[in-house]
Amino acid sequence: MVLMLPIATDNGARLAAILPTGIAAVARGLGVDPIEVLERAIGIKQGAMGAAVGIDSDSLPVLRSFVVVVVDGLGHANLQARSAHARSISRMPTRRIETVIPSTTGAALTTLTTGRLPGEHGLIGYRIRHPELGLVSTLKDWHEISDRRAWQRSTPLFELAAAIGAKPVAIGRPAHATGGLTEAILTGAEYHGAVTIADRCAIASRLLRAGDPVVAYLYVDELDKAAHSEGWQSDLWLRRLEQLDAALDDLLRTLPGNVGVVVTADHGMIDVPEHRRIELDVDSEKFSDVAEVGGEPRMRSLYLRAGSDPVDVSRRVGEGLGKLAWVGTRSEAIARGWFGPMAPGVAERLGEVIVTARGQLSFTLPSDSPDARAMVGQHGGLSSEERGVPLALGGALEGSGFAAMVGRLAAISPATDTAPLTD
């Protein structure tokens, strides 16, 4: 039996709406037309926002500064399960939203900083096909990509933040201050590096208390690293969560009164035990038309040999894997709204057949490194645990209607089918 690909009723549009909504709230606080800012942020023509239900200036909070704290790998379900160890975050009003498809870092961080879904910005998976270089990782393989801002197609929103009079900043590890992905998704932001989570939050606190209006992106990847190495249910992951919570508590206690904070994530995590890491038999008959395999263990992308029929390959692979995976063609995934609107040339970055793991399992390859095979915590797929992320509100955003505005902004996209959030 071949399982039909599910329809994406939420393809990450709310995640995409967070930074546009925050910048618009700062614009309102600075006396700049926030509706025009929203139109520019999401790429619709001037005046078009007026017809959208519930989208008006009075629906936005009035902010001096805005901070989005992006915690790599902190899923909504992960946070709920360990809420006793994250008391500061758990006190924040929180809604569950969904990340992009695939639920992977390169795709989701780019959506967060550009306000565009993967089909538009182009970083549509972990290992995807470059027209000249072949399969490349969207996190690591940037050194041979000459035009990085063309490979990532969408403009980061930090330039818009500067245009309204705010200071755009990005705060993360010193090691992330330069590099291909940083250049592609953080262009326009002034980078501040700090080794520890506490020091990153301290930098944010100092900048916010300096007086100038700020739009800040603060990135924490320690939980993701801990989950990959030992699992999100490990003691190491729990220690990282406690460190994050303590640092955020200090940040929230030192906030000026007109600063809004969002805590969210790029994806959640599931733990995959060793016996559920299934090696794909790429030399078998059912894979005979497959030239290369990309993606990642929870969502594999099959690139076919010239002349192969994607429908036939999808059927054969799907019959072989049965209930272990959703298997469908690239065209089917696009038609079911997985990636949002598709810009020219982006579909070809994916393989013609998509294999998505179901349950707590993953699909490894014979060529995978020992480190890749040993990964416990994983993501990339469609499960509720992977795709559900928090939208937690702090500071001036508590009780402000910010979450509802995020939902309304997401819902006006013709490529999405989402119900507005309510506070």
PLM-predicted stretches and their roles:
Residues 1-423:
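Feature captures the catalytic ectodomains and active-site-proximal regions of enzymes
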